[in-house]
Structures are given as C-alpha cells and as structure tokens.
Amino acid sequence: NSCDCDIEWSSCSAYGFDHDEDYGFNEDTDRIIINTKAILLPTK
C-alpha cells in the first residue's frame, strides 16, 4: 500500500502513518498532502 496525495487521513493512518508533519497533514481539510511522487511504505 502507498499513501497517495489527497487521500483521506483515516485511510493513511490505517497504513501506519502517524506523524502529521512528515506527510503534510492539513487539519483544515482533513487530508494528507504529499509533495513527492515517491511511494511511502507503511511504518506498521
């Protein structure tokens, strides 16, 4: 699984991403914004 741009944060956190700043979590939109095309692997 990867955490792609503009997916729901709940989906992303289910993959084990739990550090907002590393992934550009935007509290205003409850979405994750990633400024790279690289695939991010789950941490859990």
Swiss-Prot record:
It comes from the Eukaryota. This is Unknown protein 1. It comes from Lonomia obliqua.
